[in-house]
């Protein structure tokens, strides 16, 4: 009777209360979301690296091409031959270029001697202003003619066939404006290239 009285009384679900309840971790509940986010980030990084490298290659190629053109902007236009007009021929060693393209390195003996009046020459105009009279002009013209004749006598003889050359009177202002235009064009191209990066 005492044993019945002192028998322990267990509450209901006592075993369930003693078993540890494990709460699910954050990674286990959001595992698929985290994996999808990682894959998307890796894909975005790969695409950005590819775009940056291709743009860098294009910019490097453009800079290299621009540097080559800046070193020698007329490298593909130097000795451009044109077909002679019918009935004309060129002497040996003479080169003619198409209009608008520069010809560099021409020998001085290939330049034709023109008989323009002395007043059209800026050098003799300065001589007239310095000496003050047409007598000085005639003296300067005769000295220039004798120098041209001696240079023509010492120069190798060319065939007598006529040939056509385009002669332009180049002044210092024209040369400076051409250099300034080239400099502005190169600067603009470099700035445009830097802005495109």
Swiss-Prot record:
Keyword Repeat part of the UniProt annotation: yes
Membrane-related topology note: Single-pass membrane protein
Annotated stretches, region: Disordered: 84-123
UniProtKB keywords: Apoptosis, Cytoplasmic inwards viral transport, Host cytoplasm, Host cytoskeleton, Host endoplasmic reticulum, Host membrane, Host-virus interaction, Late protein, Membrane, Microtubular inwards viral transport, Repeat, Transmembrane, Transmembrane helix, Viral envelope protein, Virion, Virus entry into host cell
Induction note: Expressed in the late phase of the viral replicative cycle.
Region (Interaction with host DYNLL1): 163-175
Record-linked InterPro entries: ASFV_p54
Biological process (GO), any one: microtubule-dependent intracellular transport of viral material towards nucleus
Cellular component annotations (GO), alphabetically ordered: host cell; host cell endoplasmic reticulum membrane; host cytoskeleton; membrane; viral envelope; virion membrane
Transmembrane segments: 32-52
Sequence repeats: 139-142, 143-146, 147-150, 151-154
Localization (cell): Virion membrane; Host cytoplasm, Host cytoskeleton; Host endoplasmic reticulum membrane
Coiled-coil ranges from the UniProt annotation: none
Pfam families per the UniProt record, alphabetical: ASFV_J13L
Region 4 X 4 AA tandem repeats of A-A-A-S, annotated ranges: 139-154
Summary of the function given for this chain in its UniProt record: Inner envelope protein involved, through its interaction with host dynein, in the intracellular microtubule-dependent transport of viral capsid toward viral factories. Seems to induce caspase-3 activation and apoptosis. Plays a role in virion morphogenesis by recruiting and transforming the host ER membranes into the precursors of the viral envelope. Involved in virus attachment to the host cell.
Family: Belongs to the asfivirus envelope protein p54 family.
Subunit architecture: Interacts with the host light chain cytoplasmic dynein DYNLL1; this interaction is critical for intracellular microtubule-dependent virus transport toward viral factories.
Entry protein name: Inner membrane protein p54
């Amino acid at each position: 009777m005492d044993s019945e009285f002192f028998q322990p009384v267990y509450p209901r679900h006592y075993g369930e209360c003693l078993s540890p309840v494990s709460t699910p971790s954050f990674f286990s509940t959001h595992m698929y979301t985290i994996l999808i986010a990682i894959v998307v980030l890796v894909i975005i990084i790969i695409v950005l690296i590819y775009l940056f490298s291709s743009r860098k290659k294009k910019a490097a190629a453009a800079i290299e091409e621009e540097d080559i053109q800046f070193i020698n902007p007329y490298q593909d236009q130097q000795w451009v031959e044109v077909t002679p007009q019918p009935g004309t021929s060129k002497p040996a060693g003479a080169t003619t270029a198409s209009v608008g393209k520069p010809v560099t390195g021409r020998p001085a003996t290939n330049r034709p001697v023109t008989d323009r009046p002395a007043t059209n020459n800026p050098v003799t105009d300065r001589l007239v202003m310095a000496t003050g009279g047409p007598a000085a002009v005639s003296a300067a013209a005769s000295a220039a003619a004798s120098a041209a004749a001696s240079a023509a006598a010492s120069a190798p003889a060319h065939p007598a066939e006529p040939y056509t050359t385009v002669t332009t009177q180049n002044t210092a202002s024209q040369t400076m404006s051409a250099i300034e235009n080239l400099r502005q064009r190169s600067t603009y191209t470099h700035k445009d290239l830097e802005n495109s990066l």
